[in-house]
Amino acid sequence: MQRYPMTPQGHAALEAELKQLKSVDRPRITAAIAEAREHGDLKENAEYHAAREQQGFCEARIRDIEAKLSGAQVIDPATLPREGRVVFGVTVVIENLDTEEQKRYQIVGDDEADFKNNKISVNSPIARGLIGKSEGDEARIETPSGLVEFEIIEVIYQ
């Protein structure tokens, strides 16, 4: 079984989405299909076909979330030993050595990644280049814009 690392917040968000899909979206789509069936000929019934397509997307997402939750490896960074090392779940402050610009990122699971909110996937190039390093270490990371050197300023376990 594949393991899916996620923070407690990411796990809760997936559970909430699953609940929404099962208790709100699925019944709404089922009702829409039933209503569209009442309109007669299903071959040329656009409402029916649209609702069936929506049902397929909904059921696929439910299966995807259930698989991820069954393989979830919930890691709470607040409970990790505070060794100053970059690991999954921590928030890391890094400085671009060329521009001296500092950035703050939390390393999270794939489903939690949100670059606009400074949450990067554990599988992203930046996270892969930082994992295992400690405060004060430098990391050379290949980004889409080229090779960038960062210094790890601070590792926060929260």
From Swiss-Prot:
Statement: the UniProt record of this protein carries the keyword Cell membrane: no
SUPFAM superfamilies: FKBP-like, GreA transcript cleavage protein, N-terminal domain
Biological processes annotated in GO: DNA-templated transcription elongation; regulation of DNA-templated transcription elongation
UniProt key word Kinase: no
UniProt keyword list: DNA-binding, Transcription, Transcription regulation
InterPro entries named among the record's database cross-references: GreA/GreB_C_sf (IPR036953), TF_GreA/GreB_CS (IPR018151), Tscrpt_elong_fac_GreA (IPR006359), Tscrpt_elong_fac_GreA/B (IPR028624), Tscrpt_elong_fac_GreA/B_C (IPR001437), Tscrpt_elong_fac_GreA/B_fam (IPR023459), Tscrpt_elong_fac_GreA/B_N (IPR022691), Tscrpt_elong_fac_GreA/B_N_sf (IPR036805)
NCBIfam families recorded: greA, PRK00226.1-2, PRK00226.1-4, PRK00226.1-5
Descriptive protein name: Transcription elongation factor GreA
Organism annotation: Psychrobacter sp. (strain PRwf-1)
